[in-house]
Each structure stands twice: as C-alpha cells, then as structure tokens.
Amino acid sequence: GEIKDLTTEDCYVTFMAGIFRSVRFGAASSHGKANMMCFNFFESNGAFTRNTDGTYKVDFAKMKLAVNSWAEKILIYQGNGDYDGALSYLKDNATIKEQLQKELDALKTANIPVDIVFEQGKEALGL
C-alpha cells in the first residue's frame, strides 16, 4: 500500500537510522562499504552532526544538498565508466572512522544485540 503523510525529512532520518543499523554488522560487505561511503560523505558535507550526548542530528537543508551531491558523484563515476576513480574513492571512504567505531564498541559492550533473533520451530515450542 501507499505510505501517506511521509515527509522528505522523515526519509532523511530513516535513511540515517538505517545506516547506523547496517554498520553494526561491519563495513566488510558491499552494503557496509556503500553505507560507510555514504555516511562519510554526508558527514563531510555537514548533513548531520554528533551532539555532545552521543546522539546525532540531521541538518535537513545540508542533507538535501548532500544527497544531491552524493547522487551526482556516483552517477558521474558510473556515467564516465571511471572504475579507477570509483575504486580510489572506495578505498579512501568505505571505512568506519574512530569516533563511530567507539560508539559501536560501546553498544557491543552494553550487550545490545546487533539483530533480533526469534527462536522458532518445534524445539522452541517444546514439541
């Protein structure tokens, strides 16, 4: 069905939340690398800030510009067939930086699960 009453700002915040969730699995997979490149690009363009209490805040005006610039960057690499440029960008930007890694480590130390696992089947039901 159609999702109604959804703003662009809602989408920005949800997208960032998705990146935070995804990166908890690491940045080794293609999805993890892509998300870290995006996160680092947004960070360097001021699309969000980290507050002193460890929370993050999206700057909606800067996020809009960053999303457009990010799409432009990717499309230019693809359109020009610039494999070497894309690979260089990947190597430089598909990493978890120190501050974010500290925050991820704190989640692990607090035993906050990366993903929820539901026990299912006959054994879980005692059958």
Locate each region found by the language model.
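Long, well-structured alpha-helical subdomains associated
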Residues: 2-90
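Non-catalytic terminal regions of proteins
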Residues: 64-127
